[in-house]
Swiss-Prot record:
Associated pathway: Nitrogen metabolism; (S)-allantoin degradation
PANTHER family: UREIDOGLYCOLATE HYDROLASE, UREIDOGLYCOLATE LYASE
Function: Catalyzes the catabolism of the allantoin degradation intermediate (S)-ureidoglycolate, generating urea and glyoxylate. Involved in the utilization of allantoin as nitrogen source.
Name of the protein described by the UniProt record: Ureidoglycolate lyase
EC class name: lyase
Subunit structure, as described in the record: Homodimer.
Superkingdom, taxonomy of origin: Bacteria
Length: 169
């Protein structure tokens, strides 16, 4: 079983999968009579159908036991999905490129710095939210509308991957 190498999350490395949502290194302009920096359009919400709505939710996630066998990935074919950490904790991101099914050899893992969020582009394969704290909260921006917006792919036992944060140290 291949152990995923966990990479630091950067805009350049994550670009094939979506957007890194962060203020560091991002352009801004002043608003509110000069008292507020607006970091504008850090990510774009994608929706596939005209009647779709962009919605905001909060996910409260429990830590999964590590090392973790990556048995499945999911994708949202009708809209993007963004996760922004509310408690400032780093979290793990596991992704694979667009395609009919995720290719195990192309799966990548990233570690955020706690001040970064991610916006998965429409159709990008990813693991459900992976907190490394006992519990963590995320502001989630995604799509509401008709049609199935969650495809799941389960790997065969031979294709499964291992996510082990301790192996990177």
């Amino acid at each position: 079983m291949r152990t995923l190498k966990i990479e630091p999350l950067t805009k350049e490395a994550f670009a094939p999968f979506g957007d890194v949502i962060e203020t560091a290194g991002s352009d801004y302009f002043m608003i509110n009579n000069g008292s507020t920096r607006r970091y504008h359009k850090l990510a774009t919400v994608e929706t596939a159908q005209p009647e779709d709505n962009a919605i905001i939710s909060i996910f409260s996630a429990e830590k999964l036991e590590m090392p973790l066998r990556i048995r499945m990935l999911e994708r949202h074919p009708l809209g993007s999905q963004a996760f922004i950490p509310l408690l400032g904790n780093p979290f793990l991101v596991v992704v694979a490129p667009l395609g009919d099914v995720p290719v195990p050899g192309l799966v990548r893992a990233f570690l955020t710095n706690g001040r970064q969020g991610v916006n998965y582009h429409r159709g990008v394969w990813h693991h459900p939210v992976l907190t490394i704290e006992k519990r963590d909260d995320f502001l989630v921006v995604d799509r509401s509308g008709s049609g199935n917006n969650c495809d799941e792919h389960f790997f065969t036992e031979d294709e499964q991957l291992l996510l082990d944060p301790q192996s990177n140290q």
